[in-house]
A protein has these predicted regions:
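Active-site neighborhoods and metal-handling regions in enzymes and metal-associated proteins
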Residues: 1-175
Length: 175
């Protein structure tokens, strides 16, 4: 990833831009939701059929980009995923797409949270408590402006309106 980042923005004015790996960059086995960071002497063998979340993050000039996906461990790359796991993947994808489409100028963060809840429930799933979508700023990964996957009565959250210059890292988790 560092090698590929070195190929980006190579002009005179931009070649000195800071760039590198960013959090989260990890592989989290199924029993851990995200950000697995084992000690150097720990190891874990992934098992056939286990759900695994892969997260990659990088930054250029202090702005983070990250991508994540969940896969099913399989020795056969052509193996089909079906049943509840396939439904969960479909629910996660469709719910994320709806959340992104709701994240528009004039809407509120709680509108996005409500859309996540409604969409996941249509598939018979529930958004996880805890993971948030954070507003990003220069050299700041998790700002105080958040979009919750699920409203939690005791959780402090600050409603705000979406405006044109906001940048969010959208994270979505369902069970």
């Amino acid at each position: 990833m560092v090698e590929e980042l070195g190929k980006v923005f190579k002009g005179k004015k931009t070649k000195k831009l800071e760039r590198g790996v960013a959090c989260p960059t990890c592989v989290s086995p199924g029993n851990l939701l995200m950000n697995f960071s084992p000690l150097s002497d720990e190891s874990k063998t992934l098992k056939e059929g286990e759900l695994v979340r892969i997260d990659l993050g990088c930054h250029i000039n202090g702005y983070v980009a990250h991508a994540g996906t969940t896969i099913v461990v399989s020795a056969d790359p052509a193996a089909k995923i079906d049943g509840e796991v396939a439904d969960l993947f479909k629910a996660g994808w469709d719910t994320l797409q709806l959340a992104i489409r709701t994240l528009v100028f004039g809407k509120k963060n709680l509108d996005v949270t409500a859309m996540i809840k409604r969409s996941a429930e249509q598939f018979g799933f529930e958004p996880y408590e805890g993971p948030f979508s954070h507003k990003h700023k220069h050299h700041v990964l998790d700002e105080t402006a958040i979009i919750m996957n699920k409203t939690i009565p005791d959780q402090r959250h600050h409603p705000f309106q979406i405006h044109k210059s906001l940048l969010f890292g959208q994270g979505l988790f369902c069970s």
